[in-house]
Amino acid sequence: MKPKKTILCVDDNEQALSIRKIMLETRGYRVLACSNGEQALEAFRRGGIDLVLTDLIMPGVDGSRLIEEIKNLSPQTPAVLISGRIKIYERETLADVFLSKGMYEPAELLERIRVLLVRKRGPKRPAELRHSAVDEEHASVA
């Protein structure tokens, strides 16, 4: 059984944070939820984070600054930035993916996260490819 990937999920809106946390946990991810950028930086520094998912507009350390700090500490850590303000993304950001609130389906967010985590891990080794092909074959029979 492969270990769960850990996602640092950050939003000052408790309802949005809760919804994303539940959605990610039901897909098998471990989620560390933080309500501000300062908490998120502390959590990231403790280690074990595979991906960062953050809102842009937050008091104190905003999402763009949070991603900048995280990329300084760990450039390979993928980051997803979410905002209700599309124009904001036109400024320079270190986020790997930008999604506009209300303009994406949950399935799109989940797929973007999956792809970023695969890229971080790197290509599968030949043995992993054989195992995943066998797993897919068995799944289609079931």
Task: Give the positions of each predicted feature.
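Active-site residues of response regulator receiver
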Residues: 55
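Conserved acidic segment of CheY-like receiver
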Residues: 4-15, 20-24, 52
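Receiver (REC) domain active-site loop signature in two-component systems and cognate sites
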Residues: 58
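Non-catalytic signal-transmission and effector/linker regions of two-component phosphorelay proteins
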Residues: 1-6, 107-142
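Acidic catalytic/metal-coordinating carboxylates
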Residues: 35-39, 62-65
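Short hydrophobic/Thr-rich beta-strand motif most characteristic of the beta2 strand and flanking loop
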Residues: 28-35, 43
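Short amphipathic alpha-helix used as the core "switch/output" element in two-component signaling
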Residues: 42, 64-76
